[in-house]
């Protein structure tokens, strides 16, 4: 017998904003997930940078000290060039300290800081279907 393992090209071949498969923190089943640049050793990095969530999760983006210094946009960074996705449900967040996005459709949603993406201040959110209300899928 021959078994073939197929991998999704959307998740394996594309490393949106430098997020590889093993980089994604699994936060499925949580109603609210917070992403912040609050690491005292590296303020130019989001925590978690790459995360998997369930459809319908509210994502809270927190900027330290504020979005005026770290404007956040939905979009990709490739080859050192940031491209804003005007259709992204993320942002833009350019003032204040808290921004929210309700991610209801399965897919991958990359984001970045417009001032510091060259320093690695970017990430991606994978949204997966929640097949059962009890969290088992």
Residue spans for each PLM region:
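N-terminal signal peptide c-region/cleavage motif recognized by signal peptidases
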Residues: 5-12
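Extracytoplasmic copper-binding redox domains, predominantly the cupredoxin/blue-copper superfamily
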Residues: 14-131
